[in-house]
Amino acid sequence: MRKKMLASLQWRAIRMTTGISLLLFVCLISFMMFYYRLDPLVLLSSSWFGIPFILILLLISVTVGFASGYMYGNRLKTRIDTLIESILTFENGNFAYRIPPLGDDEIGLAADQLNEMAKRVELQVASLQKLSNERAEWQAQMKKSVISEERQRLARDLHDAVSQQLFAISMMTSAVLEHVKDADDKTVKRIRMVEHMAGEAQNEMRALLLHLRPVTLEGKGLKEGLTELLDEFRKKQPIDIEWDIQDTAISKGVEDHLFRIVQEALSNVFRHSKASKVTVILGIKNSQLRLKVIDNGKGFKMDQVKASSYGLNSMKERASEIGGVAEVISVEGKGTQIEVKVPIFPEEKGENERDSSIID
């Protein structure tokens, strides 16, 4: 339909210019006849190379009119075609496209106005997308805030109720053992089993509470925050904890993620590994920040680890969010090693140019 319309427009221009040429031809012949008082028979009899002169003039007029109409119509058709193609591009949602200059007449003015319209629509779309992103970020932040508050409430309730009751059970069983020294071995053994189970439950509860209500950096550097965290774990857990943490000048976001990864790793160790020793190492080597958490616990078979394991997935996701990778290596009966590698770019290196000799 559009091509037919443009073709019709071009042919109309050809017909118009050809008609004007014929009219001028008739006017010219009439002027020559009346002004020079020429006999029409003379004009008809005049020839050039055997071709009547009047026929030559007629052919020249028609040719000039046709050529002029074709060139003008084709140029007009091309400009309108460009304008229509551009409108279709805008209709398809590509508002970044701009119509090329089409001249200073009405068509060019229409193209300029369409470009201005596309620019305004593009800005409005960008503004809507920005608002949508901000809304999504706000919702995510609200969700995190609600989850954090709920975890704090749950941790507080567990500490005030279950943890205190477990402590009371442990104390009562210890007191009972003092008063039943003369009881049979079977009874004493069962009481000691209850005491041991209460102690294990207390350790599990401590690890769970630290996981639910974790310590945060709160303006401290990563080394200081990790040192306080590890010292707190050492006081609350019957396990040997060693660490070698290098000072690192990295961004706050990277520090927060690494701190959370260590928290998650320690929580997993205390809750599942049955380890007697944990080592935490943090240093820089080959333009990479490397974090290792190593325990001598029971380990697990790598091919049997659950893909849905929340702790391992959480650490891998946090490492990925800061452009790093988290690798887990475990040998059944020998322990587990979690290693996180994060690239350090030149602007982040600062004082970290020297490699850490503790990272192998």
UniProtKB/Swiss-Prot annotation:
<keyword id="KW-0547">Nucleotide-binding</keyword>
<dbReference type="GO" id="GO:0005886">
    <property type="term" value="C:plasma membrane"/>
</dbReference>
<keyword id="KW-0597">Phosphoprotein</keyword>
<keyword id="KW-0808">Transferase</keyword>
<keyword id="KW-0812">Transmembrane</keyword>
<keyword id="KW-0067">ATP-binding</keyword>
<feature type="transmembrane region" description="Helical">
    <location>
        <begin position="16"/>
        <end position="36"/>
    </location>
</feature>
<feature type="domain" description="HAMP">
    <location>
        <begin position="74"/>
        <end position="126"/>
    </location>
</feature>
<feature type="transmembrane region" description="Helical">
    <location>
        <begin position="48"/>
        <end position="68"/>
    </location>
</feature>
<feature type="topological domain" description="Cytoplasmic">
    <location>
        <begin position="69"/>
        <end position="360"/>
    </location>
</feature>
<dbReference type="InterPro" id="IPR005467">
    <property type="entry name" value="His_kinase_dom"/>
</dbReference>
<dbReference type="InterPro" id="IPR011712">
    <property type="entry name" value="Sig_transdc_His_kin_sub3_dim/P"/>
</dbReference>
<dbReference type="InterPro" id="IPR036890">
    <property type="entry name" value="HATPase_C_sf"/>
</dbReference>
<dbReference type="GO" id="GO:0005524">
    <property type="term" value="F:ATP binding"/>
</dbReference>
<keyword id="KW-0472">Membrane</keyword>
<dbReference type="InterPro" id="IPR003660">
    <property type="entry name" value="HAMP_dom"/>
</dbReference>
<feature type="topological domain" description="Extracellular">
    <location>
        <begin position="37"/>
        <end position="47"/>
    </location>
</feature>
<keyword id="KW-1003">Cell membrane</keyword>
<protein>
    <recommendedName>
        <fullName>Sensor histidine kinase LiaS</fullName>
        <ecNumber>2.7.13.3</ecNumber>
    </recommendedName>
</protein>
<dbReference type="GO" id="GO:0046983">
    <property type="term" value="F:protein dimerization activity"/>
</dbReference>
<dbReference type="InterPro" id="IPR017202">
    <property type="entry name" value="LiaS/VraS"/>
</dbReference>
<dbReference type="Pfam" id="PF07730">
    <property type="entry name" value="HisKA_3"/>
</dbReference>
<keyword id="KW-0902">Two-component regulatory system</keyword>
<keyword id="KW-0418">Kinase</keyword>
<dbReference type="GO" id="GO:0004672">
    <property type="term" value="F:protein kinase activity"/>
</dbReference>
<feature type="topological domain" description="Cytoplasmic">
    <location>
        <begin position="1"/>
        <end position="15"/>
    </location>
</feature>
<keyword id="KW-1133">Transmembrane helix</keyword>
<comment type="function">
    <text>Member of the two-component regulatory system LiaS/LiaR probably involved in response to a subset of cell wall-active antibiotics that interfere with the lipid II cycle in the cytoplasmic membrane (bacitracin, nisin, ramoplanin and vancomycin). Also seems to be involved in response to cationic antimicrobial peptides and secretion stress. Activates probably LiaR by phosphorylation.</text>
</comment>
<feature type="domain" description="Histidine kinase">
    <location>
        <begin position="153"/>
        <end position="346"/>
    </location>
</feature>
<dbReference type="GO" id="GO:0000155">
    <property type="term" value="F:phosphorelay sensor kinase activity"/>
</dbReference>
<dbReference type="InterPro" id="IPR050482">
    <property type="entry name" value="Sensor_HK_TwoCompSys"/>
</dbReference>
<feature type="modified residue" description="Phosphohistidine; by autocatalysis">
    <location>
        <position position="159"/>
    </location>
</feature>
<dbReference type="Pfam" id="PF02518">
    <property type="entry name" value="HATPase_c"/>
</dbReference>
<dbReference type="Pfam" id="PF00672">
    <property type="entry name" value="HAMP"/>
</dbReference>
